């Protein structure tokens, strides 16, 4: 292969083994870079796919978490790896947006070969149980009364959660303060602890906390309700 392989977050790529076998494949473990810390949605889903990928590819899969800079740190590491098929990356939406918000030493579509879409799901805005909010309109009303006083967490700058919440603010004429984290894992920890009142994220990492009543769903980015919240 002349480019690194990317497995996108949003069924494991059954075409991948045929592609790599046709071009020769290293007889050693595959390094699967997850450009986020452990505990977030990308890491969680990558670990769900890990056994199946190892079975299909016929090689051990070693997950390497390289969090930082909204996924850019891990992506740079992956781009610098030998283009021999031994390094793959499991990505999230920021791989599509990072080039627009920061300077990278590569062009994403030139440095990587997309393999497969792995999972998809809606974003959800949640509030800690200690807040008075039970729906998103209440957040809008509070933010209009006192702009820039409510904080909301995301997994990092430039991700879909950040971009979509910024768009909501522009369209809804209200302002809340973005608190970017170094991944969904650290962000959900602070959201559950009540250190940040609002958290915009995907459903995967908060569904259990919603069921337990620690986090309260205020709205989802779908036209219809989702069974996960």
Locations of the language-model features?
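Hinge/capping helix and adjacent helix->loop/strand transition within the periplasmic-binding protein
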Residues: 80-86, 100-186
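N-terminal twin-arginine translocation
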Residues: 1-25
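Short, polar/charged alpha-helical segment
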Residues: 42-57, 162-169, 209
């Amino acid at each position: 292969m002349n480019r690194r392989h990317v497995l996108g977050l949003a069924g494991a790529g059954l075409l991948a083994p045929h592609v790599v076998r046709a071009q020769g494949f290293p007889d050693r473990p595959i390094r699967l870079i997850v450009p986020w810390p452990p505990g977030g949605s990308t890491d969680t889903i990558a670990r769900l796919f890990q056994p199946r990928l190892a079975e299909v590819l016929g090689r051990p899969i070693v997950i390497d978490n390289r969090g930082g800079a909204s996924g850019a740190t891990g992506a740079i590491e992956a781009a610098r790896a030998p283009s021999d098929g031994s390094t793959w990356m499991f990505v999230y939406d920021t791989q599509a947006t990072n080039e627009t918000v920061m300077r990278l030493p590569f062009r994403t579509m030139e440095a990587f070969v997309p393999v497969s879409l792995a999972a998809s799901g809606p974003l959800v805005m949640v509030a800690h149980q200690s807040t008075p909010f039970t729906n998103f309109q209440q957040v809008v009303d509070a933010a209009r009364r006192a702009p820039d006083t409510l904080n909301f967490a995301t997994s990092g700058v430039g991700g879909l959660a950040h971009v979509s919440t910024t768009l909501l603010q522009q369209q809804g004429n209200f302002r809340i303060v973005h608190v970017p984290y170094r991944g969904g894992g650290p962000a959900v920890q602070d959201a559950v602890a009540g250190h940040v009142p609002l958290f915009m994220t995907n459903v995967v990492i908060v569904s259990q906390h919603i069921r337990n009543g620690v986090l309260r769903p205020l709205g989802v980015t779908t036209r219809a309700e989702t069974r996960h919240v």
